[in-house]
């Protein structure tokens, strides 16, 4: 009995030990699986929620940005259609846009010219004031009368005929937008007797534009370039005119003629010619650089005769900006014409700017008043100091023409 009970006790003890080991292993495996399951549910789920929220926010931002881009594109399309519509609505719209672009270009040129003036010094003499530069009023034209130290009598003849004196000239600037000045530089000895004589004349009449330029017959090309650069910096005008002091001019007729070309951005107006290139030394108008114009006997390109010509604002701006690289030929009218070669410039050949002193009278009687009159044989009015009044009497437009003119 005791042996059987003892044997059963051992079996039960062994069985309990076996069962407890099984359960222990099972429970360990179970807890391990439960731990994995618990971890999967507790941690990845919030992370996926964060990613999901970020994705949603990102998608929302992309959607809004896309809508903004679409609206911008639609706005641009509408704006483009509006602009094109405006262009097609008016036949003058393209010309107006071209003039606006030209105005912006000249404003840029103004800024460049001002900067160069500050960096390199003013192009005019130190004793000359520039009140117009501050106001920048708009003018129709600036008429520069080219003169020399020895031409006092010529200047007086011009003052007595077609250039209004003193207060009348100032009134002309204010009411008609026409500026008129005698243009002269300084002598090779600044402050000498010649300069003092001009200064005294300026104090009396106040009608000079003094240039930072040394006077000399062979320096006319440089003087012309300096004149346009200086006038462009001082006065905001539609046109800049150069005329010699031995030429008769009808100012009202000139203004009316130039006003016809106001919508032309780049226009060069004068009596166009093409004379022979003179290679022989010692003759008048000898061309030292004749070889640049081809074989002997060739002619110059078309250019305005030097007695009187006019250029538009854009061309004056071009000269001002490029003054340091523009080549100077010995003849100033040839130089000016060469500066416009290669540019999109309209050349206007107007024969009313170069009437003869014998023709201008009957033309005036017929109602076809000349803009300018002179004698071709003298490249100006022969003995102009003595004959200017007579030419003015016969060929002038009348004393009231300028007052009644509207441009």
Curated annotation (Swiss-Prot):
Q: Which UniProt keywords apply?
A: Glycosyltransferase, Golgi apparatus, Manganese, Membrane, Signal-anchor, Transferase, Transmembrane, Transmembrane helix
Please give the start and end residues of each transmembrane region.
Answer: 23-39
Q: What is its EC number?
A: 2.4.1.-
GO cellular component entries: Golgi membrane
Q: Enumerate the Pfam families for this protein.
A: DUF4094, Galactosyl_T
Among InterPro entries, the record links this protein to:
DUF4094 (IPR025298), Glyco_trans_31 (IPR002659)
A Gene Ontology annotation in the biological process aspect, one of them, is:
protein glycosylation
- Topology within the bilayer: Single-pass type II membrane protein
GO molecular function annotation? hexosyltransferase activity
Location comes to: Golgi apparatus membrane
What pathway, per the record? Protein modification; protein glycosylation
Q: Which Gene3D superfamilies match?
A: 3.90.550.50
**What is its cofactor?**
Mn(2+)
> Which family does the similarity line name?
Belongs to the glycosyltransferase 31 family.
Functionally, this protein is described as follows: Beta-1,3-galactosyltransferase that transfers galactose from UDP-galactose to substrates with a terminal glycosyl residue.
Provide the protein name: Probable beta-1,3-galactosyltransferase 4
Task: Write the gene name.
Answer: B3GALT4
